[in-house]
Amino acid sequence: MIRRFTLLVSIVICLMSCSTEDEKITPIELSTEGIDFRVEDMLTLTANVPQEGIEFSLTGIGVYADKVCVSDITIDGHIQNDPSMPIISFCGDWGSYEQNGNTIDFTIAPNQGDKIRLFEFTIGGGYWVRFLKIIQAKE
């Protein structure tokens, strides 16, 4: 009987500790330079870039500006980094980025392929996040 009561109390405590108000995901506010993003949904910004490539900057603004970092890079469905370890600079044949404070400078290299390229960047993480989708035209 005591075991059942203890189990019931444990379940109730677990359920009460899960609050959607405490677990609200908040989009990081960004200022952009050199690229025009459109809002896809509350957390996702999307942009089209030319085949020739582009250079642009993102700067975290507002209350959660200090949460700005690139935590995930996916290109055409392939993860490029270890998402568990935010890094301040990264490069590959696709281009590069470098972070300085709350600003991240990106360079997207020319697309030499015959297919469009899809870049997906996760900025921030946890409860403070912004997803970027960049679609690059094909050659």
Language model regions located:
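Sec-dependent signal peptide recognition
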Residues: 2-8
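C-terminal motif of bacterial Sec signal peptides marking the signal peptidase cleavage site
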Residues: 14-17
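Bacterial signal peptide processing site
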Residues: 19-22
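C-terminal edge beta-strand
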Residues: 24-25, 33-35, 104, 126-139
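Post-signal peptide N-terminal segment of mature Sec-exported envelope proteins
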Residues: 28-46
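Surface-exposed binding patches on compact interaction domains or structured appendages
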Residues: 51-103
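Short, hydrophobic beta-strand segments
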Residues: 102-112
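A short beta-strand micro-motif common to beta-rich folds, especially ectodomain repeats
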Residues: 113-126
